[in-house]
C-alpha cells in the first residue's frame, strides 16, 4: 500500500491550465449522427493525449442500429499490471463520454469530464509504478443516445466475467454557481443538499458505498475546502431516475460498484444542452479539485487494499 502522502503529492500534479486547454479543444458540436467529422477530430485529440501520456490506446468498436449500423468507438487507455500482479484481473475504470447533443458545444456536458479524464490519466501514468490493479481510462461514445458505448463495454465485461473493483463516471464536472438558491434539488432525496451550486455530487450504488466513503476521506486531504455531497442509492437508483443519467448506470445494472461524479448538470447549469454551453462558463478551479480527487482515488484503489463495508 502506498503512503498517503505520496498519493496526495501525486494528485496535486493535476494542472488547471491543462484542463482549460482540453476544454477549449473539445468544446465543438460533436454528435455522431449529425457531424461525424467533428467526432473524428475529438477522437483523434483524445487518442493523441493518451499517447502523449505514454499510455497504450485501444479502440473498442460498437454498432448502433438507429444510425444504420454505423461503427462507433470507445477509446481505452490502460495502465497495466505486471504479470505477477496480486490484483489479478481486477480493474479500475475511470470514464467520461466525449459526444455532445446536437447544436451544443458541450463544454460542461461533457468536455469537462473528458478534460478531467485526460488529466487524471496523465498524472496517474506519471506516477511511474506498476499498480496492483489494472487502470482503464475510457472515453465513451454515444452517451447522449442512451449510454450506448458504456453499455457495450459493461456488457462485454460482464459476459466475460471480468471483475471490476470500481468504476467512476465523470459527467458534467465544471459548472458552479455561488448564488443562493442556484441549486435545484430532486424531490424525494433522502439527504440534505446545499442551495448554492458549489459542491461536487458523488452518487453510488450500494456496492460502491465503501468507495464513496474512501473518496470523502481523500477529498479532505487533497482539497480540504472543496465541498462534496454523497448519496448512496438502493436498487440501482430506480426510485430516483435522475441519479441514473450517465455512463455509470450500465455498470450499476450489472452489479459493478460505480460512482457518478457530477456538478448535477441541469439541476444547476442553465447552459446544459444549449448552444451557450461554452468554456468561459466553467470553473476551472472546481475542475482542478475534481481531477486531483479522481487521481487520489484511482491511485488508492489501484495500489492498496480495496475499501470494504464495516462488519455488521
Where are the model-predicted features located?
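Sec/Tat-exported extracytoplasmic proteins
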Residues: 23, 27-34, 50-54, 79, ...
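Proline/glycine-enriched tight loop/beta-turn segments at coil->beta junctions
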Residues: 82-91
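Extracytoplasmic/secreted proteins, especially bacterial periplasmic and envelope-associated proteins
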Residues: 18-21, 25, 37, 41, ...
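N-terminal capping segment at the start of a domain
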Residues: 1-38, 99, 268-277
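A non-catalytic alpha/beta surface segment that caps or lines the substrate-entry region
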Residues: 21-82, 228-232
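Structural recognition of the beta-strand scaffold that forms the well-ordered cores
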Residues: 22-25, 76-78, 92-95, 136-139, ...
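Active-site-adjacent substrate-binding region
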Residues: 180-312
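Acidic/histidine-rich catalytic neighborhood of metal-dependent amide-processing enzymes
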Residues: 70-71, 100-213, 240-243
Amino acid at each position: 500500500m502506498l503512503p498517503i502522502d505520496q498519493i496526495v503529492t501525486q494528485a496535486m500534479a493535476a494542472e488547471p491550465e491543462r484542463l482549460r486547454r482540453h476544454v477549449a479543444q473539445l468544446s465543438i458540436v460533436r454528435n455522431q449522427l449529425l457531424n461525424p467529422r467533428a467526432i473524428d477530430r475529438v477522437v483523434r485529440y483524445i487518442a493523441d493525449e493518451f499517447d502523449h501520456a505514454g499510455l497504450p490506446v485501444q479502440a473498442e468498436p460498437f454498432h448502433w442500429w438507429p444510425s444504420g449500423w454505423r461503427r462507433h468507438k470507445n477509446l481505452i487507455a490502460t495502465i497495466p499490471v505486471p504479470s505477477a500482479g496480486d490484483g489479478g484481473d481486477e480493474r479500475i475504470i475511470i470514464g467520461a463520454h466525449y459526444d455532445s447533443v446536437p447544436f451544443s458545444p458541450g463544454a460542461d456536458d461533457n468536455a469537462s469530464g473528458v478534460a478531467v479524464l485526460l488529466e487524471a490519466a496523465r498524472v496517474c501514468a506519471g506516477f511511474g509504478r506498476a499498480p496492483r490493479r489494472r487502470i482503464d481510462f475510457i472515453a465513451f461514445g454515444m452517451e447522449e443516445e442512451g449510454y450506448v458505448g458504456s453499455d457495450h463495454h459493461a456488457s462485454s465485461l460482464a459476459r466475460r466475467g471480468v471483475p471490476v473493483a470500481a468504476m467512476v463516471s465523470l459527467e458534467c464536472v465544471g459548472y458552479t454557481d455561488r448564488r443562493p438558491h442556484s441549486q435545484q434539488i430532486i424531490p424525494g432525496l433522502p439527504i440534505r443538499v446545499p442551495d448554492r451550486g458549489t459542491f461536487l455530487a458523488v452518487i453510488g450504488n450500494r456496492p460502491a458505498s465503501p468507495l464513496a466513503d474512501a473518496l470523502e476521506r481523500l477529498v479532505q486531504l487533497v482539497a480540504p475546502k472543496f465541498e462534496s455531497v454523497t448519496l448512496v442509492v438502493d436498487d440501482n437508483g430506480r426510485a430516483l431516475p435522475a441519479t441514473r443519467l450517465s455512463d455509470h448506470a450500465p455498470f450499476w445494472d450489472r452489479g459493478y460498484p460505480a460512482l457518478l461524479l457530477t456538478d448535477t448538470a441541469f439541476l444547476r447549469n442553465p447552459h446544459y444542452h444549449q448552444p451557450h454551453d461554452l468554456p468561459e462558463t466553467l470553473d476551472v478551479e472546481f475542475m482542478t479539485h475534481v481531477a486531483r480527487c479522481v487521481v487520489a482515488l484511482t491511485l488508492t484503489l489501484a495500489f492498496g487494499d480495496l475499501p470494504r463495508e464495516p462488519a455488521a
